[in-house]
Amino acid sequence: MINIVKSINNILTKGELLLHIEPTSTAIKSVLKINYKLYILTKDDKTPKEILFFSSTLTPGNVISDLDEWATQEILRFVIHGGLRDYE
């Protein structure tokens, strides 16, 4: 997932992507909610702008690499559907 963000940053001309991953507790101790926030920092702005948010749960049966692959697909889906067209 980090590699795809780096690759996208190599072709963006009007900004840089920043990825924030935040695990949060749930009511069930063995389950974590993982929040993913994708920001863009443009050359004209001093603060990043959130452009994509998605989340998933990590349960004892899940593998973190599966979650990473899923998150990568979410980012690619966003890009393919034109989510970054203003920053190319």
Regions found by a protein language model. Give the residues of each.
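Negatively charged, low-complexity tracts enriched in Asp/Glu with abundant Ser/Thr
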Residues: 1-22
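Generic short amphipathic/hydrophobic targeting helices enriched at N-termini
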Residues: 1-7, 27, 47, 59-60, ...
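Detector for Asparagine
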Residues: 3, 9-10, 35, 62, ...
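Extended low-polarity, hydrophobic cluster-rich segments
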Residues: 17-23, 34-38, 71, 75-80
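Intrinsically disordered, low-complexity regions of eukaryotic proteins
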Residues: 18, 24, 46-47, 52, ...
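Acidic, low-complexity, intrinsically disordered interaction modules
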Residues: 26-66
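Mixed-charge, Lys/Arg-enriched low-complexity segments
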Residues: 53-88
